[in-house]
């Protein structure tokens, strides 16, 4: 779908701003369709175009002159990357960043819809801004990100949070200048939410957070439709960037001196599958990027279904592709996996793990797990625990199932009592802590290479950073070491971190092309 087609199907509250009625929520309910699994599955047939000509119109260039902005970001790395893009656009409009919310002229809340707790935090944040809006009515408050793509969320804001000036979604960040202008001119709340994704927009300005590590989007959206997940609806179908655009961005980051990049996508393993006539996947992209002078390259998030032997081969070759694989399993029971729509079985997952470990003996495996899924029995949960023992994950992100409106799982009977869910989470977390501590202990007495990222959050006399396998290391050293890869001798292994002694700067170079 190209930009013109996209605009013709967008939700246009802007055109209604001059109407006398103020019942925008009713209007929105009529034109906005809630997530439809049936319709969403058809979307792969629509064409995706690439826009290389993004420019900010000159008439917007001084819009933010003398004004400040603040963006509060919730959620995943993709949201963090979107925040960098929005900061880049606002900077190009003349706005300057501030960390003081009371002095910000524009406040954007970049939201996450993955769990109910994240949404509750956002609504609390919006509510807290009501007092600020009364004191400074000229402040523009905007809500964006994944929550903005949900009908129920937008209607709630329209009805209960009149301090919000504008709402926009994940598909039209590049239209921020136009949306901002409308917010300044309109007396009503501005809502521009695209229910379908648009073109892949290149050349968007970015203000990256720091100059050590960088996010690099390689694709957008997800077509897996796990039954618990809202992301395929809030982020749209899978759209891969062209390899040459990604490689050019990585080369530019190398020239700027970045030490680590993370290739981003809701399902990075599916990279390239949506581009007709391109026999080029994530393994090929990793191999090409391995020839660029970036010391470390990571990728996230992986779906086991699309994890290929080609990827394993490239990671096994070493170089700058780190030996850390985050491979969400979600459950160890086949019946639960089937209800989740995960497309693999316990056996196929373990077979993949075995292939990874065979070819990459030094790999660090981590995962995501959900407990208390609808109809999950004690016996089924026990299979998750035994799978954890079999794989020996070095860490896991664990969650109690959170119902998301609009997903197939939301229609299921959530019949696992909350106290049972909490007990299962506690059991699982004990196992996570046990295996994490075991993984950490093998580093005692060893020298590791640490990318020093800054001072410790707990002690500003201590520096901290991560190993290639994503282990947190704390050590004392001159602050001039920040941004460098250094050698650290590990004196003490803790449950989730390592303490060490600084030895030297690691001046090992990466082979370049």
Curated annotation (Swiss-Prot):
Q: Boundaries of each Radical SAM core domain copy? A: 208-438
Instruction: Drop me one GO molecular function for this one.
Output: metal ion binding
Superkingdom of source: Bacteria
Q: Where is the MTTase N-terminal domain?
A: 67-185
Provide the E.C. number(s) assigned to this enzyme: 2.8.4.3
Report quaternary structure and partners: Monomer.
What's the protein name?
tRNA-2-methylthio-N(6)-dimethylallyladenosine synthase
Source organism: Staphylococcus saprophyticus subsp. saprophyticus (strain ATCC 15305 / DSM 20229 / NCIMB 8711 / NCTC 7292 / S-41)
The organism's taxonomy opens as:
Bacteria, Bacillati, Bacillota, Bacilli, Bacillales
